[in-house]
Amino acid sequence: MKIFPAIDIKDKKCVRLIKGDFNNKTEYEISPVDQAGKYKDHGFKNLHIVDLDGALTGETVNLDIIKEIVHKFDLKIEVGGGVRSIDSIEKYINAGVEKVILGSAAIKNKNFLKEACQKFPNKIALGLDAKDGYLSVSGWKENSNQLTLDFLKEVNDYGASRLIYTDINRDGTKESPNFEETTNVANVSNCPVIISGGVSSIDDIKKAKGLKNIEGIIVGKAIYDGDIKLEELVKELDA
């Protein structure tokens, strides 16, 4: 299973939000580039980056930082946060990013998702962020009226190569992921699923390994707060 240590960038700094709330954020002293280097040095191969400035503006605000991370370290990087155009996807792919995550823009406009998957085969990940079974959009500030599983069934054949499922109620809480709902999503999804939100311990990683159609797991706040040591986490890697 793949493990994706997370870097969320806001104002050029590493931050973590609680339940996606920009007013409830923790800033960390280490820079995004140095944090990526730390992950690389410990033997991680994959990285999950969210441009939180991009999530708010719809622009590739931290593209230069992401480019620097790509060029300095041989990591497979997935990037999300406010990607709303083919142009933005191209910028990230040209920068060397492995997969670009489409969230709100894909939920609001299914044709955009379909076009992106056709234009960039194997490069598009679908990011579904849900609260109480319903998808959220626009940096989690808006709830859509769409049930996660209903939406997934509609777009399942569009060609996304990865699905990242986040339970917003768990994100940044370190209360363990919502394994039950993630399993429901993985059972429906045509592509492999990444678990996100609430990872608190190595036990969560071990539990994720036993689930079907799960490609990997994203770990964020538990690393920054020292609940999970990178030395322990890297032992769980097998991809």
Curated annotation (Swiss-Prot):
Q: Which reaction does it catalyse?
A: 1-(5-phospho-beta-D-ribosyl)-5-[(5-phospho-beta-D-ribosylamino)methylideneamino]imidazole-4-carboxamide = 5-[(5-phospho-1-deoxy-D-ribulos-1-ylimino)methylamino]-1-(5-phospho-beta-D-ribosyl)imidazole-4-carboxamide
GO biological process terms held by the UniProt record: L-histidine biosynthetic process; L-tryptophan biosynthetic process
The residues responsible for catalysis, as annotated, are 8 (proton acceptor), 129 (proton donor)
Q: What SUPFAM superfamilies does the annotation carry? A: Ribulose-phoshate binding barrel
Give the Enzyme Commission number.
5.3.1.16
Compartments reported by the entry? Cytoplasm
- SS bond partners: none
GO cellular component term, pick one: cytoplasm
> Entry's CDD domains?
HisA
Predominant subcellular localization, coarse grouping: cytoplasm
Q: Which HAMAP family match?
A: HisA (MF_01014)
Q: What is this protein called?
A: 1-(5-phosphoribosyl)-5-[(5-phosphoribosylamino)methylideneamino] imidazole-4-carboxamide isomerase
Native source species: Pelagibacter ubique (strain HTCC1062)
Which gene carries the instructions for this protein? hisA
